[in-house]
Amino acid sequence: MSEETKADETKVLDSIDILRILALLPHRYPFLMVDRIEAIDSDLSCVGYKNVTANEPHFQGHFPNNPVMPGVLIIEGMAQTAGAICIHAKGADRKPSLVYFMTIDEAKFRRPVRPGDVLEYHMTRLNKRRNMWWYRGEARVGGEIVAEARVGAMIAEE
């Protein structure tokens, strides 16, 4: 097996834990919406995970006695997942970069996400041009699609 093949396999089998996500993204509590990323194929695709807990501040007002995760935060989690793999694909020695969320298209929300759910963000790259990326994302809980959208982001270069 060539060194190039080994490197490609490593990229496909790679995973990013919360400590690495914190090193890649500038987002912090309470606005960090991804806990782990797996099944990474360079910047082409991945699956991010978010453990939804009742302790998150948005549940205090959305909605009292009927906690539902705001859809915009689900979409934000998709964008953060895509941004993290873009930065990760640029190289392991990168410091946190600013990722600007540029577009949201074709967003659909299928069912509520509640405390105790584990969100899976299935992201697939649609296009890349210079420092901009576009992804199609599906958010799933228990294999069921709960939201979907196309998102575009730009990584600010220093």
Curated annotation (Swiss-Prot):
Predominant location: cytoplasm
Family to which this protein belongs: Belongs to the thioester dehydratase family. FabZ subfamily.
Record keywords, A-Z: Cytoplasm, Lipid A biosynthesis, Lipid biosynthesis, Lipid metabolism, Lyase
Stored HAMAP family: FabZ
Organism: Azorhizobium caulinodans (strain ATCC 43989 / DSM 5975 / JCM 20966 / LMG 6465 / NBRC 14845 / NCIMB 13405 / ORS 571)
Catalytic activity of the protein: a (3R)-hydroxyacyl-[ACP] = a (2E)-enoyl-[ACP] + H2O
Biological-process GO terms, alphabetical: fatty acid biosynthetic process; lipid A biosynthetic process
GO cellular component, one term: cytoplasm
Active site residues of this protein: H62
Name of protein: 3-hydroxyacyl-[acyl-carrier-protein] dehydratase FabZ
GO MF annotation terms: (3R)-hydroxyacyl-[acyl-carrier-protein] dehydratase activity
InterPro entries: FabA_FabZ (IPR013114), FabZ (IPR010084), HotDog_dom_sf (IPR029069)
Claim: Transcription is one of the keywords in the record: no
Record-listed E.C. numbers: 4.2.1.59
Function (record text): Involved in unsaturated fatty acids biosynthesis. Catalyzes the dehydration of short chain beta-hydroxyacyl-ACPs and long chain saturated and unsaturated beta-hydroxyacyl-ACPs.
SUPFAM superfamilies given in the database record: Thioesterase/thiol ester dehydrase-isomerase (SSF54637)
Subcellular location: Cytoplasm
